[in-house]
Each structure stands twice: as C-alpha cells, then as structure tokens.
C-alpha cells in the first residue's frame, strides 16, 4: 500500500468531485487539502475547465504554483518551478481552439447539427447555465485547445457528429454538464503521464499516484493511476474501469467533496 509520507501525487477532477456540482462548495475536503499541503503532496487539478478558470480555483484552494491539467488534457499548466521546461508556462496539445471552432461552424452550417457553443453566447448566459458569477463565467470562454458546447440534437445525430469529428482527428467527450471537442491526441491520461514522468525525472523516483473523479471523462485518468477513487456522481453512465480491483479502486457512498474526503479517508486513515 502507500502512505502520505512517501513520494505521492494526487490527481483530482473538480466539478462533482472536489467541488459540489451545484454550489461549488469544497469545504468538506478542506482538512485533507491542508494535510496534503503540509506533507508536501502535490494535488494536481484535472478538469475540462480552462486554465484561466483553474488558476483562479487553484489559488482559492491553496494549491497555487502546482501543475494542473486543463481542457480535458489538451492543456498542461506547468509548475512555477518548471520554468526551464520547453513551453513554459503551458503546453498545448493538438490543434487550437480557433481551428476547432472553424470545424464546428462548418459542420453546423453544412450538415445542420444542432448545438450551442460557449462562443455563441455571452458571459451572462454562461452564468445562468452554470451558477457562476459573470466574472468567473467569462473565464470559461478562454479556451486554448477545445470547445465546450450544449448538444441540442438527437442521439442518432450525435453518433453521426461524433463519427465526423473522429474522421477529422477530433474527439467528442462528455463532461459533468457539457460536451467538449478536442484533438484526438489529447487526454487526461496522457497529460497525467507526462506530469508523473516529469516528477520522476526531477526526483529520481516514480511517485505513487492516486486519482479522484466522478464522470465518464475521468475514466482515462483513473485508468493510469495506481489507486483510484470513483466519487458517486450525477452522470447516469457512471465510471467504469478495466481494473476495478477493490484494493486499487474505491467507490464512494457520498457525492462531491464529501465523497472526495471519504476516498482519502479510505486510502489513508486506515493505514
């Protein structure tokens, strides 16, 4: 097993995992965040959110300066002390937000798929959709390598849309509330593996990894973790992993930050 004293990295999704899906509250997780910070265990946020959103949340959570994974792995924000790494401060995978937007606009115009992207509306509308303040909602529009959208067509059309995106080298990914389009080469798992390898190179030892998530788009991340917490979520599909050995994977009874705390309690407090 593992302990909080050994080289360890914690990777965590945000909405529905570390943050409450509705209120964005994270206080139930605060004691564990403090304990991990005191033990110098990096908590690496991993989300579909933009890096601008996540840097704001990172500071709120007391995790500033650490690396993070934004836009479902298409963007890696490097740790403050990694300034000598090529690409600092951010590494972007695949094609840009602007290029993806052009593809989507073409598909919508020529093939009449029905969806609304965050680029189609203003920050006031996004604030209504999400419950965020307008200033925070504005940060959700600062995509660098993905597009977030609401699907407004049938399941059959979604299958056709997904196939067209795949033909064009893109992927269509479901998040907690919205859908995301990004380069097919990007992913939370690839981004996490890159960060793990970087820590290993800097320390000379591979860290043990623990990941926490609640939605289908967290599955690739949790697959590459040594240990995983599947936080009870709202998504009807849930999270399914290839290896669900109970010694490696814990499914929580609670949702959001309560479940996050439960997962940490399970893997650490009993050891």
UniProtKB/Swiss-Prot annotation:
Its cofactor is Mg(2+). The active site is at 13 (nucleophile). The keyword Cytoplasm applies. Gene3D superfamilies: HAD superfamily/HAD-like, Putative mannosyl-3-phosphoglycerate phosphatase, domain 2. Its EC number is 3.1.3.70. It is an enzyme of class 3 (hydrolase). GO terms for biological process: mannosylglycerate biosynthetic process. One of its GO terms (molecular function) is mannosyl-3-phosphoglycerate phosphatase activity. It is found in: Cytoplasm. Signal peptide: none annotated. It catalyses: 2-O-(alpha-D-mannosyl)-3-phosphoglycerate + H2O = (2R)-2-O-(alpha-D-mannosyl)-glycerate + phosphate. Keywords: Cytoplasm, Hydrolase, Magnesium, Metal-binding. Its main location: cytoplasm. GO terms for cellular component: cytosol. InterPro entries: HAD-like_sf (IPR036412), HAD-SF-IIB-MPGP (IPR006381), HAD-SF_hydro_IIB (IPR006379), HAD_sf (IPR023214), MPG_Pase (IPR012815). This is Mannosyl-3-phosphoglycerate phosphatase. It comes from Escherichia coli (strain SE11).
